[in-house]
């Protein structure tokens, strides 16, 4: 069955327009399934619920726009405890099968309708503002589009813009396909993540273009019994003022069997990140064929082409997360920053391979200056001896580390001085990277901290 909806300017914006679309979706669902096609026009709506066996298709020229009045939205149960998640959403699919959201139309979250400026960044181009959520973190639809416990979910073609918080959140779903989405979020909005995959299985993301202020594509497992596994992210173009591609930091459950491949990063702060703030696990993740830069347009400090970290994050629970078997292969990045692989004492990263990783450095960011003055929690905060050390590659509490054909291309005459590698509590380390040199070359290539480094195979040594 196919239902066509034509935009009617006489219909008041908000709940009435949402009710029209909802009525069509429910009719198709009750008739056994089909397509609801939204024609060109601007639809200012509150929450719309997708149903099993129904495809909501947004034609080119259709714009689904979030109504600014949260009192018109239903209050929904949260899927996880997180300050960035509110009980309000624009499009929701919950406990559905064979559900689709497709088309060339636009989903518009009207971000600034829910924000207020909290300070001007005078040294940034164009006087860009930073924003905070008006009325507290729950005073916005976030995630804007959310799917919970759905099976056979297809998302294709549409554009998602101006989300007031998280953009697309896929929670505890199975057999998910995300193809050809365009996502645009404010660079200085509060937690404007692009695509979040949370505790979901058999997920394929491909050919997406994501440009956001917070993480572009991120995998999580926020509930202790959740599993985020068998996920591929391929052929995407990304930009972020945080992480372009990543796992964590909210991992209370398990993330495993993940591949990120053939992606281009226009700009980022951290091109690739794997973070553990809770006591979950990450196992078997591959990052391959990724090229780009960690040069944020607005000069955000503490760039890192690759960042892996385990920390307690101020929790009273002393149990720490686990990271096992990460591979970074065929990575090219222009960056001012370091590769940082750290774990808080009492934990360790077990099994990391960097193979054919080439970092071109236009100028060197001095971590002894930039790290101490940053309030960020994403700076190896529980590794005081290494978090600001001057070295291209920093490893702290790492077991089974292999560096093969890793290269840092320093700027001619660049300062400050940088060791090629710094290790603390590193065991079973294989160094096969003759082009990983210190700056200048006369400086000791490797800096050892502490007495717990052991079983180091170092055929490459200049100093």
What are these regions (language model features)?
Residues 1-463:
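Extracellular/periplasmic carbohydrate-active domains that bind, remodel
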């Amino acid at each position: 069955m196919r239902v066509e909806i034509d935009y009617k300017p006489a219909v008041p914006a908000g709940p009435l327009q949402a009710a029209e679309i909802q009525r069509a979706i429910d009719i198709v669902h009750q008739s056994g399934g089909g397509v609801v096609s939204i024609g060109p026009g601007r639809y200012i709506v509150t929450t719309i619920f997708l149903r099993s066996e129904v495809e909501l298709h947004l034609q080119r020229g259709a714009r689904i726009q979030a109504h600014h009045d949260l009192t018109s939205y239903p209050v929904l149960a949260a899927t996880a405890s997180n300050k960035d998640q509110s009980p309000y959403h624009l499009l929701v699919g919950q406990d559905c099968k064979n559900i689709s959201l497709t088309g060339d139309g636009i989903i518009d979250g009207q971000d600034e309708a829910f924000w207020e400026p909290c300070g001007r960044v005078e040294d940034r181009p164009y006087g860009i503002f930073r924003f905070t959520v008006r009325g507290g973190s729950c005073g916005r639809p976030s995630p804007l589009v959310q799917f919970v416990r759905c099976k056979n979910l297809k998302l294709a073609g549409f554009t998602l813009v101006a989300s007031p918080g998280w953009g697309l959140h896929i929670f505890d779903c199975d057999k998910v396909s995300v193809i050809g989405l365009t996502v645009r979020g404010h660079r200085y909005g509060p937690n404007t993540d692009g695509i979040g995959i949370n505790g979901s299985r058999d997920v394929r993301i491909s050919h997406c273009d994501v440009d956001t202020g917070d993480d572009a594509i991120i995998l999580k497992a926020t509930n202790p019994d959740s599993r985020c596994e068998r996920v591929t992210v391929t052929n995407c173009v990304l930009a972020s003022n945080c992480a372009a591609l990543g796992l964590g930091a909210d991992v209370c459950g398990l993330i495993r069997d993940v591949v990120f491949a053939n992606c281009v990063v226009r700009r980022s702060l951290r091109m690739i990140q794997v973070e553990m703030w809770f006591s979950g696990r990450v196992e078997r993740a591959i990052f391959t064929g990724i090229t780009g830069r960690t040069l944020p347009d607005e000069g955000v400090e503490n760039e890192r082409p690759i960042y892996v970290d385990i920390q307690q994050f101020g929790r009273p629970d002393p149990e720490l997360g686990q990271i096992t078997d990460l591979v970074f292969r065929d990575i090219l990045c222009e960056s001012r920053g370091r590769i940082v692989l750290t774990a808080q004492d009492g934990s360790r990263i077990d099994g990391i391979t960097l193979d054919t990783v080439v970092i071109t450095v236009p100028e060197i960011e001095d971590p002894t200056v930039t790290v101490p003055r940053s309030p960020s929690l994403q700076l190896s905060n529980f590794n005081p001896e290494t978090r600001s050390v001057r070295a291209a590659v920093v490893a702290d509490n790492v077991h089974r580390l292999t560096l093969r054909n890793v290269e840092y291309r320093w700027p001619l005459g660049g300062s400050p001085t940088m060791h090629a590698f710094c290790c603390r509590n590193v065991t079973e380390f294989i160094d096969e990277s003759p082009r990983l040199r210190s700056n200048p070359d006369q400086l000791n290539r490797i800096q050892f901290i502490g007495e717990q480094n052991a079983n180091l195979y170092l055929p490459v040594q200049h100093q």
